[in-house]
Swiss-Prot record:
Assigned protein family: To M.tuberculosis Rv1815.
UniProt xrefs under InterPro entries: Peptidase_S1_PA, Peptidase_S1_PA_chymotrypsin
Signal peptide interval: 1-27
Name of this chain's protein: Uncharacterized protein Mb1845
Keywords of this entry: Signal
């Protein structure tokens, strides 16, 4: 499933802004960063990647809601622009099945966009990175924090992880990344679900191709 959402939200934001009090208008801008908790309707998820130049953020498509995207304390950070979500509804999935699961969020003008993880490490996008079984990766979710392990298997647009990578409710949409000693982390996936007992993420390489097809941009930092 692929959906693009009209840009009518700009008028909504303008109308809401007109009703702000001076105290609200002068408040510090919300900092938007990978690994932060976000809310959409009754969904609580983790933000996966933020492109400060494009002012677009990404999370899992199954995290989407019908209205604004907010922070944990319900401050509006942006609105849904596009998503893909064909996440299977059962408890198992065949390795040949393609899983697409991303949401693009156009950030509000008054937020500060950052690509810095809660650990203080920058998270960069290099869509051409190819994963291999056994490769060391880390995942950040608002429920479990940062956990690290290895790639278990690489499948059709998604991969599974083991040996220490954990997940709980609320971690969906969080970044999966390479974390070399020193230097920035490199995003390689967006957390999707648990399949066959293994935490799983959609490939950032595949997701970037889908974003380019849907929106005409490639997330880079």
């Amino acid at each position: 499933m692929v959906r693009l959402v009209p840009r009518a939200f700009a008028a909504t934001v303008a109308l809401l802004a007109a009703g702000f009090s001076p105290a609200t208008a002068s408040a510090d801008p919300v900092l938007v960063f990978p690994g932060m908790e976000i809310r959409q309707d009754n969904h609580v998820c983790t933000l996966g990647y933020v492109d400060p130049a494009l002012k677009i953020a990404f999370t899992a498509g199954h995290c989407r809601g019908g209205g604004a995207v907010t922070s944990r304390d319900y401050k509006v950070i942006g609105h849904l622009r596009a998503f893909r979500d064909n996440t299977p509804s059962g408890s198992t999935v065949a390795t040949h099945e393609l899983i697409a699961d991303y949401e693009a969020i156009v950030l509000a003008d008054d937020v500060t966009a950052s690509n810095i993880l809660p650990s203080g490490r920058a998270l960069e996008s290099r869509p051409g990175v190819v994963l291999h079984p056994g490769q060391a990766v880390c995942h950040f979710g608002v429920s479990t924090g940062e956990t690290c392990g290895t790639v278990e298997s690489v499948n059709n647009g998604w991969f599974t992880m083991s040996h220490g990578v954990l997940s709980e409710k609320g971690d969906s949409g969080g970044p999966v990344y390479l974390a070399p000693d020193g230097g920035p982390a490199q995003i390689v996936g967006i957390f999707n679900s648990v399949w066959g007992g293994f935490p799983a993420a959609v490939s950032w390489r595949s997701t970037s191709e889908q974003v380019h097809a849907d929106l005409g941009v490639t997330p880079l930092a």
